Amino acid sequence: MKHNFLKSLTIPALAAIFFATGCTKKIDDAFANPNAQTKQPVEQLLPGIISNMAIQHSANGTLYGPQNDGLYFGRYVQFWATNGTGNQYDQMGDNFINRSDVLGSIWAMHYYGMGANISRIIEWGTEEKKWDYVGVAQAVRAWGWMTLTDVHDDVILREAFRPEQLVFKYDPQPDVYEEVKRLCHAALANLSKTGDGVNPANLAISDRYGNGGDINKWKRFTYGVLARTFNRVTNKSIYQPDSVIFYANLAMQNNSENTTITWSNTGGTGTYSFWSPFRGNIGALRQSKFIADLMSGLNGQFPTGNVDPRAPYIIRENPNGTYKGIRPNKGSDLLTSVNDRPDNFWGDAFSITAAPGSDNAARYIFKNAPIFPIMTAAEIQFLKAEAMLRKGDKAGALTAYKKGIELNFQELRTNYEVSVPAARRMTDAQRDAYLNNSLVVPAAADLTLSHIMMQKYISMYGWGVTEVWVDMRRYHYTDLDPTTGQQVYRDFAPPTGIDLYTNNLGKWIYRVRPRYNSEYLYNVDELNRLGAFAPDYITKECWFSKP
């Protein structure tokens, strides 16, 4: 949590001066408190809240949001790896030994970047009967709670957003998920209201870089949050596939209803994506062998022997024109020929880590101001397919599965094709051949969890890093598909032995620690209660993935 320790120091000091001098004028009248709450138009608060759903840059050091943490989570799920060896994140580690705030960006996003501003929109928007703003704020807070607990497990819930407190009690994950559901239903009720201060044109201005003020899209997003939340507990007896399916059917059904973020691209640092050449934050990252093999028809789940038509849209070819990648903590050990090493995500050679002067050669979500998905119709179809398969409805699962792939193809062609060289753009014939390949889209009786989860992984490559990490932890990285006896994530090889972070004590990562520079400095008793000072705390499994 953000702690107002300066306030606790300055107020007693000012009071002492007041009484010592015998001044009779009230301090509040004499010295306007620059930190005092003043009412601001809710229209001015919403843009910053929405930007936090990707990355927030409000001042030096305030790089809060999923894009920042995603640089590291992406190593855990092997979207990418560092182009060298010895990186603790490639080894499924953290940076606690250096008292670092790395992996604390979602924590800061929720409690600081969004925090009080969402509370004020809900309070002031209610006073002004701007139910559309209230509903959006509640929907984003629900998403924030879900995202926060997904990566940290126990978090501060009941005592959150209390500026008078310096220390806070933590609450268990089931309570947080219940709050997510409560907020979603409250959001839907407010988003359904009309009249009073509701003004779609007014909302569209504040929501310019998000859903554009489209209430239907915000409702679809909120239903998607509910579908995600109900699908978290697939390993438990309380799992309800019908609830996942119900909310998935109310969430986005086509790509025009996707929730996405974009940037103004106008010159200031905060007007560009955190993963862009302008920001220069991903110069050392290279696509993994896992994704490259998956997109090259070399993965055991989809052994087509042919390149997936989506490959040039989401990953990079090498000088030989093929798709290869690197293994965690191994650098380019298997790619002895320079011509086998993939270009970086900005289109320069493997060896180059400096950002280029423009994003002309960048593609997909790695451009300066890309369309950056937060939730898509394709993801929702894969959620639905998994729930239907678990329920035993294989025909329904196959329909949703195929639709998810089709939606992903459409999304890539609509939003990202302009950056793909003409010679590498997919044709309708290539798309149809892929979808008609029984190795990819089998008969209903042959559909497996591996089919669904691996295609979901492809459809969320890059942007969906936090959600994919949830999925991989639900399947404990290497759980077996009950139908095939093979790993659900076929050929996925988490680091082991010397490639696994020493402090993990031989175990894989399942959570990240609370943000260091608030919790480990001020909330020591609570963290001791949770065991969060243990070197291997990050290997402690979250509640959602346990039986």
For the regions a protein language model found, what residue spans apply to each?
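Active-site/pore-lining binding-face segments in mid-to-C-terminal subdomains
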Residues: K402-Q486
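Structured, solvent-exposed acidic/aromatic patches
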Residues: Q40-E43, T82-Y416, P442-S450, Q455
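Amphipathic alpha-helical surface "interface" segments used
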Residues: R75, V198-K217, G268-S273, A423-D428, ...
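Bacterial Sec-dependent N-terminal signal peptides
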Residues: M1-A32
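Membrane-proximal, proline-rich intrinsically disordered regions
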Residues: C23-A81, M109, N360, H476-P547
